Amino acid sequence: QVYPEHYPIVGENLLAAIQDVTGLESDDPVIQTWAKAYGEIADVFIKLEQEIYNHMLWKGFKPFKITNITQETSDIKSFTVESDEYDLSQFEPGQYITVDVSSEKLPYRAKRHYSIIDGDENHLIFGVKRDVTTEHEGEVSTILHDEISEGDMINLSAPVGGFSIENTERPQLFIGSGVGMTPLVSMFKKAASLNVPTQMIQAVVTEDERPFAQKLDSITANHEQAQLHLHVKDKEGYLEAKELEQYLSEQPEIYICGGTNFLHSIINSLKELNYDMNHVHFETFIPRLSVQV
């Protein structure tokens, strides 16, 4: 989070870097032009960011008590935090929070974004996958999984994000895989309450590794318009165009979230079916530039 008082510091260092590369003095017309341009851009950003801050439940990071930790799958946990200071039900389905943690493992404080699964007036629930491979260990996810316990305090930013339900007069279709289900749960819940046909396709490797099963089952049990379809890779293979086609007859608004390969596969299948991509929305937990639409 960058506040107005930070922009002069950024500008000073940016101009110093430009001078270092170009060899120009601070009074050179080129540097003066850069300084003026930066000032104008900074003013625009400050105004835009202030509008965002005005709609946030709180500014900066605030401490919250962790009241519940649930092992959703072998590598995904959900964390419930509690507050009587803010109305946490005001979060928008699809948004995320940022956690700020410290650990003896790290020489600095680390921050990461995690999508909100659900919430009410006094609680927020967010999901975290323990991100460990042979080549990489997620700094923050391993801290949350291995070092954080119920009763601990954790610093969170206010919910933000632009992944949200759109065109609510149309049927709604959600397609998720793995921890990519995290933002889709609350979106599915909201869509199910809108009295339009609402479907969720949850792609899993095995039936035993199905995150957020209880919440999803509760949504379908309480809303006649909501349907949940489980696609088990070990039994049915990858989710391909021929299977997707049966869910598209009513031209739903589509929301996709999952790993890079999953996103590529679903998006390519929709293109193969000549689906209108203006009604397709997706969220990645990686830089968006790595996923082409």
Locate each region found by the language model.
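Globin-like tetrapyrrole-binding proteins
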Residues: Q1-F61
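Short, well-ordered, mixed-charge alpha-helical segments that flank or form enzyme active sites
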Residues: F45, S74, V291
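FNR/FR-type flavoprotein reductase catalytic core
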Residues: V10, Q32, G39, E139-V293
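Long, contiguous hydrophobic alpha-helical segments, chiefly transmembrane helices and signal peptides
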Residues: Q1-V2, Y7-G11, W34-I41, F45, ...
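Ferredoxin-reductase
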Residues: W58-M153, V204-T206, K233
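Surface-exposed helix-capping loop/turn segments at secondary-structure junctions
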Residues: L24, L106, E166-N167
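Short, charged N-terminal helix-start/capping segments
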Residues: V2-I18, Q90-I97, S102-D118, I175, ...
